[in-house]
Amino acid sequence: MKLAYWMYAGPAHIGTLRVASSFKNVHAIMHAPLGDDYFNVMRSMLERERNYTPVTASVVDRNVLARGSQEKVVDNIIRKDREETPDLVVLTPTCTSSILQEDLENFVERASQDTKGDVMLADVNHYRVNELQAADRTLEQIVKFYIKKAKKKGDLPEGKTEKPSVNIIGISTLGFHNQHDCTELKRLMADLGIEVNEVIPESASVHNLKNLPRAWFNLIPYREIGLMAAEYLESEFGTPYIDITPMGVVETARCIRKIQQVVNAQGANVDYEEFIDNQTLHVSQAAWFSRSIDCQNLTGKKAVVFGDNTHAAAMTKILAREMGIHVVWAGTYCKYDADWFREQVSEYCDQVIISEDNGEIGDAIARVEPSAIFGTQMERHVGKRLDIPCGVIAAPIHIQNFPIGYKPFMGYEGTNQIADLVYNSFTLGMEDHLLEIFGGHDTKEVIHKGISADSDLNWMKEAKAELNKVPGFVRGKVKRNTEKFARERGILDISLEVMYAAKEAVGA
């Protein structure tokens, strides 16, 4: 166990709760001490929706520790079933309450005798997996549960839909721009003449899960959530799945060609090449923009990328392949799936970093001094401290990355959003310089603390004034080089002379 003040992927129960609260009319009961019940607050604060978060904490307190949990947990399940009339109640412990080693399966069986809805225990090892793995596992478990139930009752629909159709699997609450991506994917499918059979888990009813096998294929836009459910549906019903993320012009075209191959193999006769050409040349502005003078100004500029596997890999490819930007390193916090990530990005960047340690990532950014960062909320903080602009491309994210306006990252509209994000994330040198000369909005205090440790150096007044004269787009670099020079020589007060000496040393 490791103590951390920042986690990229949360503990396992957060993943289970994300999936359970994404479904319609599903209630989750969290068997946990008070400190673990922050999910309700987090989701209510971040997700822009009107419904309350359907999660109840069955609190582990001293009475529970003295008498055992069964009575309390069973009572809570029955009470919620009566009050909310959910279709399903999902019980999940947390890593803390798992220490008690209680037979929660028995609690579920006991409670289900007195409930109208279904009751299920989330079958997740809280010490072995993180939020994303648990979400993937819980989604598969719920899908399995309802398909087996339908089989048992004999009301599993036979055969496929008449027209080509798709299940979009993995759209969930608290995901990065998930709702916008879902809307864009539905539009894309409609343009391709493909009906959307089901979208799970977001706003899906568990009673419709029995219809999943009717689709011609499954689309898994995010590698982190949905793969296990898709693999189960493939092994059980032979439904093929496509796990190519349609992010960027090249990957969107590759995804569409794969869809063409899959539906034609099942008796359809479609050709999407004309559609791809039309979208790439006329609808998406990204292909045109990448050849424009604006984008050529970015050619060769240095960037770093960090996030979950899906977004970090897609973004690395877009920057290197479609925009000519030099990706110094690309990284992911999904250590459990590191081999896939390496295979995807190694030819598009100089170095691959696999780490869950935000300090290590911050130091890696400070070391290479990129022109822009593309990462999570944490890298945004790092960028602010280093005075390096950052575009947020992956969860975990804060409120400003749950936009009310339409901002998908997938499909052809997504390519436009990404092009804007990339271009606006780079500080344009002349613009920055002119703003400071004419006293624009960007005349903030320039001395920032270092990323690895608090700055122990004192900048004298005349040195500070000289630093202010340096154009903003290189000021951070000048400051860091000067401080490095001073530290190496044991100088505590940085004067004009020290600045000039540092400049000469770097020049030499």
UniProtKB/Swiss-Prot annotation:
Pfam families for the chain: Oxidored_nitro, PCP_red
The keyword Heme belongs to this UniProt entry's keyword annotation: no
Metal-binding listed as a keyword: yes
Reaction catalysed by this enzyme: chlorophyllide a + oxidized 2[4Fe-4S]-[ferredoxin] + 2 ADP + 2 phosphate = protochlorophyllide a + reduced 2[4Fe-4S]-[ferredoxin] + 2 ATP + 2 H2O
InterPro entries: ChlB/BchB/BchZ, LI-POR_suB-like_C, Nase/OxRdtase_comp1, P-CP_red_C, Protochl_reductB, Protochlorophyllide_Rdtase
Positions contributing to substrate binding: G429, M430
Gene3D superfamilies (alphabetical): 1.20.89.20, Nitrogenase molybdenum iron protein domain, Proto-chlorophyllide reductase 57 kD subunit B
Pathway per the UniProt entry: Porphyrin-containing compound metabolism; chlorophyll biosynthesis (light-independent)
Superkingdom of this protein's organism: Bacteria
Any single GO BP term: photosynthesis, dark reaction
EC identifiers of the protein: 1.3.7.7
Family note: Belongs to the ChlB/BchB/BchZ family.
Function: Component of the dark-operative protochlorophyllide reductase (DPOR) that uses Mg-ATP and reduced ferredoxin to reduce ring D of protochlorophyllide (Pchlide) to form chlorophyllide a (Chlide). This reaction is light-independent. The NB-protein (ChlN-ChlB) is the catalytic component of the complex.
Assembly and oligomerization: Protochlorophyllide reductase is composed of three subunits; ChlL, ChlN and ChlB. Forms a heterotetramer of two ChlB and two ChlN subunits.
The protein's name: Light-independent protochlorophyllide reductase subunit B
Organism: Trichodesmium erythraeum (strain IMS101)
Gene: chlB
